[in-house]
Amino acid sequence: MNADSRTRLNQRPEWTALAKHREELAGTHLRDLFAADPGRGAGYTLEVGDLHVDYSKHLVTDETLRLLRELAAATDVFGLRDAMFRGEKINVTEDRAVLHTALRAPRDAVVEVDGENVVPAVHAVLDKMSTFAERVRTGEWTGHTGKPIKNIVNVGIGGSDLGPAMAYEVLRSFTDRSLTVRFVSNVDGADLHEAVRDLDPAETLFVIASKTFTTIETITNATSARDWLLTELKAGQEAVAKHFVALSTNAEKVSEFGIDTANMFEFWDWVGGRYSFDSAIGLSLMIAIGPERFREMLDGFRIVDEHFESAPAEDNVPLLLGLLGIWYGNFHDAQSHAVLPYSHYLSKFTAYLQQLDMESNGKSVQRDGNPVEWETGPVVWGTPGTNGQHAYYQLIHQGTKLIPADFIGFAEPVADLLPGLVAQHDLLMANFFAQTQALAFGKTPDEVRAEGVPEQLVPHKTFKGNHPTTTILAKELTPSVLGQLIALYEHKVFVQGAVWNIDSFDQWGVELGKVLAKRVEPALTEGADVPGLDESTKALVAKYRQLRGR
C-alpha cells in the first residue's frame, strides 16, 4: 500500500462505507436483528472441518458482511494469502517466506522457497522425530545409567514453549500417563528448580528448543539443567548425550554443549516461533501423545489451511473471524478480545493465542515503513469457563467496554473421565450456552420489574446485552480438532494483518528488550556504569543492589 492519501486504508471508499454503515446501525440491538430474522440463528453459521461456527450473535447484518468482504477484496487479502502459500517472502522486514502451512503439507505436496521444494525436508524431520519419540515411549532409549526415560523437560521460551506447553495440556487425556512432562521457560531459576526438584535425573530427558542455540534464557536454563543432571548423577560430560536433545539448526553450538548432533532436530527460518510447534518444536508433545496422534493434529491443521486457501469469501471462516475483529476494533473502538474456552484442558489456549495475535499484529508501522493511522491488534485475554464467570464476566456484562468474545465448547466430555464426572459436562455446557444468550439479549428493566425487584434495584439488575460473541462448537476435543482451532486463529490473525497492511511475521519489539537486558546485567552484577541508562533505571538498579547487599 502506498503512502498516497488516495490509497491509505482509512481513506479507501470501502473503509468510509463501513464507517457510515456503523453510524446507520447505531442503536440497533441484537434483539431487533433476531426479531427481524427468525432464521438468523441457523443462517448465520459456517462449518469448517469438525468446527461449527455460529456468528449470529454479532452486531452485523448481511450488508455489514458484504461491506467487510469488499474491504478484504480492496486490501487484497486473498492475494497476500496466495503469495504466502506460494512461498513468497511476505515477511518484508526480514525478507523471509512465511510457510508454517508447509509443516502440515502432505508428502506429495510441492511448496518451494527459493526454487527448492521444502516438503521432503519437513517430512524427513517428522520421520526422525517419530523414530526418536517411539524409542523413548517404548523404553528403548535409556539414560546414562541404563534406566528408561520417564520424565521429559522441555526447555525453551516464547514459541518454543507456549505452543508445546499449551498443546500438552489440551491433549493431556491422549498422553502416555506413565510419562511426566514439564516445561521450563522463565530465566527465573525458580522455574527450573520446581520442574526438576522431584525428578530422578537418571530417568529425565531434556529437550532444548532454540533455533540458534544462543537464546539467553534458554541456554542459561539448559546449562543449569546440565549442571543439575551431572551433579546428581555424579557423572562426567559423556552423560549429556543420553539426557539432552536439541531442537536447533546450530550444529556447532549443539555439539559444544555436549549433545550428539544425531539427536538434533532442525527447523527453518521460514517458520516463525509463534507458528512453530507443529515443527520439531513439538517433539516433547510427540513423545507425550505419540507420533500417530501428532500426525492427526497436523491433519487438522491442514483441513483449515485448505479451507482458507480455497473457500469463497462468503464461506471462509478465518476470513469471517478476521473481518469481525476489524469491525469491532476499527469501527466500534473495541480494545480487547476475549477467548473463553469451556474446557479445563484448554487452560493455556488463550495464553498461546496472546502470543500468536499480539506478537503478530501488535504493530504501528505499515509494511512500507509508514505509520498506521488506524487501530491494529487487540489485547487478547481470557480463561476457561466457568472460572471466568466468577471473576471478570461482570465487566463484560455490565461494564462500559465493548468486548467481543469467542466461546469454544465441546458436545462430548473427554473419553477418560471418571464415570461419575461425565454428568457434570451438561452443567458446564449449560453455562456455555446461557452466557452467550445473556450477553446478547441482556435483561430489560421491565423483565427485572416483572420479577418483583424493588424499583431502586432495577438499574443494578438490568443488563443491556448487545455484547457480540462467536460460538465455536465441536463434537469432541481431539488432536485433529486442536489443529483445526489453531489454524483457524492463525489465519484469522493473517487476515487482520493483511487488511491493516502490517507485517504480521516479525517481532522487533521483542528484540529491543533482549538487547537492553544484556546491557543492564553488568550494572546489576558488577555495579558497572552502563552508558545510556536513564535516571529512573539507574536509581532502581542502585536500589536492587542495595537490597541484594552488593
Curated annotation (Swiss-Prot):
One GO term (biological process): glucose 6-phosphate metabolic process
Alphabetized UniProt keyword annotations: Cytoplasm, Gluconeogenesis, Glycolysis, Isomerase
Pathway: Carbohydrate biosynthesis; gluconeogenesis; Carbohydrate degradation; glycolysis; D-glyceraldehyde 3-phosphate and glycerone phosphate from D-glucose: step 2/4
Compartment(s): Cytoplasm
Gene Ontology CC entries for this record: cytosol
Family matches, as NCBIfam families: PRK00179.1
Record-given protein name: Glucose-6-phosphate isomerase 2
Lineage: Bacteria, Bacillati, Actinomycetota, Actinomycetes, Kitasatosporales
